[in-house]
């Protein structure tokens, strides 16, 4: 690569980093910069932009926005790169940090799948004084890493997924008899089972709901919606995240009910808001989101801002929610 190209790479990442870390930039613009950096950080094989992009994402942890910081952690967990580990380990162990951010850092460590994270994750999982959402996430992350490294994993056959995300748990393994939606729903809703196993059912149902015109899609979405009544806030928030991935209109009533419930925890309501943002082309969704622009919870208010920006992006038919540094404007980039 020529010096000019290297300088261009440096300039691209630095421009995005400046937008991401600026507290005076609109939040929606900072999110678009983040997703551009995520694209660069997740490129396989890594390029000369990979490490600077990871460092740029991590620089955002100084932000006051819990919403932004939790999204930073998620993006680092998708990189498949050991360079993300120290930043995530710092966040998950910082008891002064917002629990939503710490949860996302734990989930990201599980997604990266490195055994070197197990000691920290197990200690947090087993700490009775730790907040539930962090303990539960560490429990799932430990199980995911152990599964990733196990001999049993090598023997499992997994159904190919439409989604490129590294999930907190894989879908249920394929067997001679493919699990039915009622079977998966039963596992999903069984609070006596380990969370990791229930998450596997969740992602199995997700994959039966995509694409939206799949014959099983609506029934799978309806099964997932029953999980929004689960006693675990972590579990409820993950269902909302899955709905955001699916963009299935059948999820709108459940998401709207969740966002509208002022007694629901902010972590769940914010995820419902962002999921609705991905359904912005569905009639009535934008009007619903606008009702919560002045919500008492900051994480919900921030999510509404981002969700409305995403809804506009959906209506405009753009390819990827991101920012192109050359123009400084929102534009399309290839999906990571």
From Swiss-Prot:
Ranges for region Disordered: 158-179
UniProt gene name: lia1
EC numbers for this chain: 1.14.99.29
Cofactor mode of binding and number, as noted: Binds 2 Fe(2+) ions per subunit.
Regions that span the bilayer: none
Keywords: Cytoplasm, Hypusine biosynthesis, Iron, Metal-binding, Monooxygenase, Nucleus, Oxidoreductase, Repeat
Family: Belongs to the deoxyhypusine hydroxylase family.
Primary location group: cytoplasm
Provenance organism: Emericella nidulans (strain FGSC A4 / ATCC 38163 / CBS 112.46 / NRRL 194 / M139) (Aspergillus nidulans)
Name used for this protein in its record: Deoxyhypusine hydroxylase
PROSITE patterns xrefs: HEAT_REPEAT
